[in-house]
């Protein structure tokens, strides 16, 4: 496996390599180079096995000189690079030389020269050499770490230089025909495979008292720790704790601290937190970090010192996330709190006496890091006393106000804004733990005053160029967002002192005002942060008004209006991901906490069609909202005015509320795995409500105070709420239900009976499991209850069958009616076609016309009385002078008054006639005429 890993890593670097099934390895040769050959860069054959045998020989005269001569010759031969095929033999020679150093010190130079060669490029003759010799190369490089045990400072330093050169590869000095340089990362990969990092970590412990060599080893580890593989190896070798514990060791150059912190940083970044934090969370490591940080904080004035100080603080912050870290025991937590607050709260502590932060970037970052570590420290409850002693809340509240021109530290506007937001965010975590300190600082008053400033339009310009300032550029949304988060955190403590103080200061009215102000100013660019602000306002109002009728009355109609405004949001926006879902949840919560229970608010909500809006959201079939909406509707149904509104609602395709609720019931049962047939009928009359989960769970005896599975089922799904709503709407008078709905309604109607039967069945089964024998009367009672429950199931199943059969009959009747209608339509078309054919025949054939006329006259004659009644008026059927091709039909127009007297239809007559006709008969339209007066006759005298 180890060989395969090495080969795979090498193969990944050299794409297009040929697979080599079998490679015949010959005796490696190296070149003894003449001057001419060296100029050409060609390796001459040299028997490395002979050199190895020579070094293995002992007790011969002049042998040492001969051995040194051959090693020197070898070094000269490979001065341009090491071929991969010869690497195993060369390192074997190196190992033999190292073994002779103890008794023959002259071999130090030979070993030194060979190690120096390892810094040269590795050469390959074939593309596949990197894969073929991967195992040999990895073993050879691993040997370098083992050689660190040789007590030679010069040799150790050279080994470190050689390894560092792996990361700074240089091209070969001369090009050697037939060879090419291995890829630049090949040595690094082979070092990973060979586990070089482990031996180098062990070397740190070995060289504790030898500073120069130790610094070189740390430099090597600094390079090695850039790889995740090496970091994993180093972690197994306990590198983190070993390096961290010696951070504060004396070192005039400062390299030890720099390189150690860099290694720790890489280990934290590239290793799993679960593995590294336990190594660093010990008293020794934290004491070392504490001393280093204090020294850098108090005496570090250079740019480099400040950067290193911040790096140490970041490492400490990560360690502090581990609850097991003894931050309090080592005194580090107390010092960090002091450093975080000494600028805002005066302290006589000698550590900060005379200290002052500048507005440099490093000090600015330090301030943010200190705020951040306070948030982490406050998660450990024993730290609370330190936070109180350090006046952390008071220090943080110095930022909860309008920016001032004169400040302790001359931060830039952008820096101060970011610190202000960071401080308020920190307060959101700290203040809920320190309620007394919060109230003693008049926290509510300060936050509400700050919110008033956030609403005012003034010359303040927000930069919005930080994480906390996101979405707040050119406005005060970021400040408002974090202030509301702080208030929300305090309100949800449900501390009556805090909430009463807020209400007395007019928080409810102020929150409603802020909400109205925000919705009046549409800002699409900052939509996400605006939605978050609205959600927080509604949550604050919910927290304040819950269980308090007087506060609900203060919420009043203005509060209901903002709730209704949110409820009218376009449903398509719920899928936008901007926060509309959260806002809707907050709105539903505010309906529950701020409206329900206050009858004037409930009535106003109903008047404004609030129930319609709730049902509209319910009809969206979003499961995450259903449970909450149904719970709200159950409470609303206690109001007698609600039923009319619910029954009046109509959804898509004229769906009623009852039909919607029954549809939700069916969907819920399908998801729960309740057994029903294709028509929705009960299958198992003994367990009509059983879910698949209940079927899987075996009944086990439980204590009396533990709810059983049947009881828990009531609260874990929406069936009980649907039953309650339909029960309050009256099961007998639900409009707009189909036969399928009625089948389901039969089950819903008996939900409570079925559930009671389930619980009694559980009791009976538990008694059996516990092997208890109830008295005869109790046993009979249990059996009677079980039988009654089953009978109810059978009765409901029978009723469902009747409904289904009745619907089937109704469907058949409807089908027959439709079929009869279709038949009548076809028959009418046939009659119309026949009539049209007769008409065409009469108009095209005179004989047919005469025949039709005779038949008509005959029919008319047959319809008359044979004896004419007395005083009867005879009306002829033929109209003289009528020129038509069609004889008169069966409709006879009778006019007893001549048309000249009628004057046409009366529909067009003027009501105000100028002059009545003098001819009698019906009124007719006459033209207005001017009547001239008759000449007066002279009366004879």
Swiss-Prot record:
Main location: other
Subcellular compartments: Cell projection, Cilium; Cell projection, Cilium, Flagellum
Disulfide bonds: none
SUPFAM superfamilies referenced in this protein's UniProt entry, alphabetically: ARM repeat
Gene Ontology cellular-component annotations: cytoplasm; non-motile cilium; sperm midpiece
GO biological process terms, semicolon-separated: cell differentiation; olfactory behavior; positive regulation of fertilization; positive regulation of flagellated sperm motility; response to odorant; sensory perception of smell; spermatogenesis
KW Kinase (keyword) present: no
A Pfam cross-reference name: CFA69_ARM_rpt
Name recorded for this polypeptide: Cilia- and flagella-associated protein 69
Name of the gene encoding the protein in the UniProt record: CFAP69
